Amino acid sequence: MLKRKPSNASDKEKHQKPKRSSSFGNFDRFRNNSVSKSDDSIEVHDRELTNGSEEQSKTSSSGGSLGKKVRAISWTMKKKVGKKYIKALSEEKEEESGEEALPYRNSDPMIGTHTEKISLKASDSMDSLYSGQSSSSGITSCSDGTSNRDSFRLDDDSPYSGPFCGRAKVHTDFTPSPYDTDSLKIKKGDIIDIICKTPMGMWTGMLNNKVGNFKFIYVDVILEEEAAPKKIKVPRSRRRENHQTIQEFLERIHLQEYTSTLLLNGYETLDDLKDIKESHLIELNIADPEDRARLLSAAESLLDEETTVEHEKESVPLSSNPDILSASQLEDCPRDSGCYISSENSDNGKEDLESENLSDMVQKIAITESSD
């Protein structure tokens, strides 16, 4: 065993006093002890601070790594959601074209109930996917998007039957983005019924019982030809069988030298010659009385031909009494106090006799000229 060295404190004299190093006695000793104790406490505090800073740095580094992990997970989920939605749209198109869609896998983590929400930051692409349903705080699940498409299908089942403002023919093919559900897929040659025209150039129309938007630059407006108004044929009361010109008519009666005179004074058709009188011929400086007589007789013959044609076309039978004229003829004849006048006593009968005499005279004159 180790032996303890004996202390020499007992060897000192009891009456011997301790030596003072200063005038303050043992004060310096207590001061040195207090200083050493305070130094020790400072060192301990510094150690605690360093340990705390190390722990904080460890916790901060662990928190930063956790934030990176969360961001990586959110980015991965965004990509998965986008791929899933594109796949759903492609399968929907296949169903519309009659092909069978591929079933979803049971292991797909994106298929869930309507209550599942993913607290991720919304991106611009996802905003366009759900057309305003996603917010900055979160994005709805794919099941919500499919329910929205189902509602669109219900709207498509009831086609638009309202008024249209025109039709347009497509001259350029256009296939909208799969995210754009409001635009029409158009092909060259399609006929679109226009519902609304906006000044921005995006029109609304219906194609194959589907209402949607399309740009006016892809179509040509069809101008509907207005139905031509039906021509109302007015029955002419005066119609002749032989359609001749004044020149031919005057050549037939050997008076072609008066063609220019008559044309310059407004006698352009044969109808104008029917009402000509001898005073009119004198005003036209036709001085030869024989020429005037021949022209008047020819005009009267035209009038007689027209009256015979009208009589043939009349469907109203005459009365049993041949002496009494029809009502239409009586309107043209002068009458006194409403009394009917027979054809024997009328002025028309006298004019007919005079016309016959004039025609005989014209024939005699023509015979004499030919004999000469």
From Swiss-Prot:
Query: Matching InterPro entries, A to Z?
Result: SAM (IPR001660), SAM-SH3_domain_protein (IPR051725), SAM/pointed_sf (IPR013761), SAMSN1_SAM (IPR037623), SH3-like_dom_sf (IPR036028), SH3_domain (IPR001452), SPIDER (IPR021090)
Record-level GO BP terms: negative regulation of adaptive immune response; negative regulation of B cell activation; negative regulation of peptidyl-tyrosine phosphorylation
Domain named SH3 is located at 163-224
Q: Which residues carry this modification: Phosphothreonine?
A: 76
Chain positions with Phosphoserine modification: 23, 34, 74, 90, 97, 119
In which domain of life is the source organism classified? Eukaryota
Q: Which PROSITE patterns match?
A: SAM_DOMAIN, SH3
Q: Where is the composition biased (Basic and acidic residues)?
A: 37-49
Q: Which residues carry this modification: Phosphotyrosine?
A: 160
Compositional bias ranges of the Polar residues kind: 317-329
Query: Where is the stretch described as Disordered?
Result: 1-71, 90-111, 129-153, 304-372
- Protein name as it appears in the record: SAM domain-containing protein SAMSN-1
Species this chain originates from: Mus musculus
